[in-house]
Curated annotation (Swiss-Prot):
It comes from Staphylococcus aureus (strain JH9). Reduction of disulfides occurs by a thiol-disulfide exchange reaction, but involves only a single catalytic cysteine residue that forms a stable mixed disulfide with CoA during catalysis. This is Coenzyme A disulfide reductase. Substrate binds at T15, Q19, R22, S39, N42, K71, H299, K427. It is an enzyme of class 1 (oxidoreductase).
């Protein structure tokens, strides 16, 4: 009976173990998770803080006990894999409660340790990061115990924006700072103006090109020279892959600490797979490497690895498109394809349309800005982005399907988009992009 060891019990690891059990009722499967919780909804965490998700239990999908009862898979929380001996096929595990170490053998090893939040490194009792349910509970408890009012949010990526919105909706007074003037880097820079407009509309303070110089209790000194007082600080300054456990092994890492994998999510070492935030693969529609630490990729990788281990080696990963979306107050920001800073590697043209998300005469209409970049050599779509109060998700998903099938920008004229006055136009924005490209 083969023994399968999984490192990490959140989206990638728990899903992969579950899929293996669905296909294989006999294997011995054990998951090691270094933190308190398994199988929680990462994407729900800002909304738990904002009390949009009113009960945190809805963010916790499984407990180890429930997981074992339903799937006969052992999950050990507070157990951190700290080393891998791929020649002996063992892992070294640290019990974080007792500080004891032991070795566990494996026939197949699945690495899904995820990523950790970066920190600016200041010693402060009021500073928090948000990466898991423990962090969420700590933030919520601190707010309640200390009657928090003023919160400094550092960073302007998706998580920071979602946290800021939810703090505001909870009735607190957040302020946003970011070390550069480039916010929400997955979007085109000039399409991010609605973020600043939404902040201005609600009189939420923000400062770009600003950084913290020192923290002394509740007194924050900024590099601009300003000194302000805050009850709480939440850092959203990016993440890094949890790859320290790899250093003892023969597994190759790239210069950023990610594990390169093939189309079966195999590493360079036999019997070891890597999925989720730690793995790097490639785009589907262009020949470029891609690291896309989002939920869809982790779940897709989990399914493919499960099939491989169960004996079906015909299924391979075809690549990422990087489809992503975020809500910020009244606006939705969505994009798909290569990142803005990767476009320079192509000879491309851009075409864009701004018009109502639905028929102009139907009430509640608002502008939707849609932009498409295409390769001039073959006219295939490289990237698309959309911003608006409604309809951005629909258009980006349609364009994602077009890119998946390597359609040209000209073929967008042929798309028969569902039309009724509350939803779109007889010639939708998708069609108009195709006509304008001609």
């Amino acid at each position: 009976m083969p023994k399968i060891v999984v490192v990490g019990a959140v989206a990638g690891g728990a899903t992969c173990a579950s899929q293996i059990r669905r296909l294989d009722k006999e294997s011995d499967i054990i998951i090691f998770e270094k933190d308190r919780d398994m199988s929680f909804a990462n994407c729900a965490l800002p909304y738990v803080i904002g009390e949009v998700v009113e009960d945190r239990k809805y963010a916790l999908v499984y407990t180890p006990e429930k997981f074992y009862d339903r799937k006969q898979i052992t999950v050990k929380t507070y157990h951190e894999v700290i080393a891998i001996n791929d020649e002996r096929q063992t892992v070294t595990v640290l019990n974080r409660k007792t500080n004891e170490q032991f070795e566990e053998s494996y026939d197949k090893l699945i690495l899904s340790p995820g990523a950790s939040a970066n920190s600016l490194g200041f010693e402060s009792d009021i500073t928090f990061t948000l990466r898991n349910l423990e962090d969420t509970d700590a933030i919520d408890q601190f707010i309640k115990a200390n009657q928090v009012d003023k919160v400094l949010v550092i960073g302007a990526g998706y998580v920071s924006l979602e946290v800021l919105e939810n703090l505001y909706e909870r009735g607190l007074h957040p302020t946003l700072i970011h070390r550069s003037d480039k916010i929400n880097k997955l979007m085109d820079a000039d399409m991010n103006q609605p973020i600043l407009d939404e902040l201005d509309k609600r009189e939420i303070p923000y400062r770009l090109n600003e950084e913290i110089d020192a923290i002394n209790g509740n007194e924050i000194t900024f590099k601009s020279g300003k000194v302000e007082h805050y009850d709480m600080i939440i850092e959203g300054v990016g993440t890094h892959p949890n790859s320290k456990l790899i250093e003892s092994s023969n597994i190759k890492l790239d210069r950023k600490g990610f594990i390169p994998v093939n189309d079966k999510f195999e590493t360079n070492v036999p019997n070891i797979y890597a999925i989720g935030d730690i793995a790097t693969s490639h785009y589907r529609h262009v020949d470029l490497p891609a690291s896309v630490p989002l939920a869809w990729g982790a779940h897709r990788a989990a399914s493919i690895v499960a099939e491989q281990i169960a004996g079906n080696d015909t299924i391979e990963f075809k690549g990422f498109l990087g489809n992503n979306i975020v809500k910020f107050f009244d606006y939705t920001f969505a994009s798909v394809g290569v990142k803005p800073n990767e476009l320079k590697q192509f000879d491309y043209k851009m075409v864009e349309v701004t018009q109502g998300a639905h028929a102009n005469y139907y009430p509640g209409n608002s502008p939707l800005h849609l932009r498409v970049y295409y390769d001039t050599s073959n006219r295939q779509i490289l990237r698309a982005a959309a911003v608006g109060k409604e309809g951005a998700d629909k258009r980006i998903d349609v364009l994602s399907m077009a890119m998946m099938n390597q359609l040209t920008v000209d073929e967008l004229t042929e798309f028969e988009v569902a039309y009724a006055p509350p939803y779109s136009h007889p010639k939708d924005l998708i069609n108009m992009i195709g006509y304008k490209a001609k």
